[in-house]
């Protein structure tokens, strides 16, 4: 009887409460709370912000383990990443006015490259923006297909900004300085990957537009 039973119909409410999506909601809450304590409580901020970042690895694992991969989860994951980093960078713009333009450019690159990369991947019929063949881009293939590489580079990217943040407080200035120095190579790799995926996304979209234009021309 159990082998022939009809699987329960999945509803929107089920998807909303998938285990990885619940983890995603916790990520949003901890990231938001970290903004409230960011100005005066570096220890509390570090714990909350780190929790939000570390849960990023857990939600993907749970999605695969329980077969609960969803578009909602993928989008929630990406916008939480971008929003939490943006919040920290906004604070750094205020505290490091001499580097404000640099932070603005890096934030723009981060948001633009990830949005265009996801949109272009979906437009090309791919189920995930992380599906990058080695022939398309060796760097992005390494970055997106190796979970250890993806986790390490993303961690270094966050640690670079976190190190700059910690340098603002006397009790953690030295630790913050070394955190920034050690994470810098990974940070450079991340920005390079952003540039590469931005270029790749633009080419994919342009190629799709060219194909559509040629198809329309055939009708005339």
UniProtKB/Swiss-Prot annotation:
Binding site for a CDP-1,2-diacyl-sn-glycerol: 60, 64, 70
Temperature and thermostability: Thermally inactivated at temperatures above 30 degrees Celsius.
Side of membrane Lumenal, spans: 42-45, 97-98, 167-170
Single biological process term from Gene Ontology: phosphatidylinositol biosynthetic process
Catalysis performed (reactions): a CDP-1,2-diacyl-sn-glycerol + myo-inositol = a 1,2-diacyl-sn-glycero-3-phospho-(1D-myo-inositol) + CMP + H(+)
GO terms for MF: CDP-diacylglycerol-inositol 3-phosphatidyltransferase activity; metal ion binding
Transmembrane segment boundaries: 21-41, 46-66, 76-96, 99-119, 146-166, 171-191
Subcellular compartments: Microsome membrane; Endoplasmic reticulum membrane; Golgi apparatus membrane; Mitochondrion outer membrane
Residues annotated as catalytic: 81
Chief subcellular location: membrane
Membrane-protein topology: Multi-pass membrane protein
Keyword list, A-Z: Endoplasmic reticulum, Golgi apparatus, Lipid biosynthesis, Lipid metabolism, Magnesium, Manganese, Membrane, Metal-binding, Microsome, Mitochondrion, Mitochondrion outer membrane, Phospholipid biosynthesis, Phospholipid metabolism, Transferase, Transmembrane, Transmembrane helix
InterPro entries: CDP-OH_P_trans, CDP-OH_PTrfase_TM_dom, CDP_ALCOHOL_P_TRANSF_CS, CDP_diag_ino_3_P_euk
Known function: Catalyzes the synthesis of phosphatidylinositol (PtdIns).
Protein name, per record: CDP-diacylglycerol--inositol 3-phosphatidyltransferase
Gene label: PIS1
